[in-house]
Amino acid sequence: LYILLGFILIASAVDLYSHYNIPSLYNIYKNRGTRLLFALLITIGLLIAVITMPPKFLIGKHILWISWVAVLGYVLYPLAQLNRRIFEQTKILVLSYMALLTMITFKWPHKISLTWGRTLLMLLMVLILVRIVGFFRPYTSQTHFMISYAAVVLFSFFMLYDTKLLIVKAKKCVKADYINDSLGVFLDGMNLFVNMFHLRR
């Protein structure tokens, strides 16, 4: 529920920013400077606040979560400005793809191992390092395409892994923190969206 609600809120936030012509961070994709760093710091800071706040503080945790989603929408807003048609098409594509991966996980859960976690984390660190290098020494468009393609593959496996993790937690009936439990799949979807958008441009 929170995964779907998060996507709806982000899409609504982007539409709201566009409707009221809110100044965006469009130039962060061209002039990579303090604005990008500032946006990333706010996003990470809010995410940490959401994760660390106990679920018993229901209202406060939801306010932080909604604020984080709104900031994510603002960070994604420049993509809608770059090409609104591709942005809308990618939304449908990613939601369909995530639904497919979810069905695969439920159909063949034994094919997905929770031992993947360490390997996936190591590959994610490599991807982040590659992105950081590109921040200071821009890659060619072909290299960007290859990196985005690799990221889609990586986060597809993350999606399978995180969905399996949700299934296992649900079966164990552990104390639920629905927002935190949904963050893995939600972030997988966001990363799939960004990288698929760049592949389609």
Positions of PLM-derived features:
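A hydrophobic alpha-helical transmembrane-helix feature that marks the membrane cores
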Residues: L1-R201
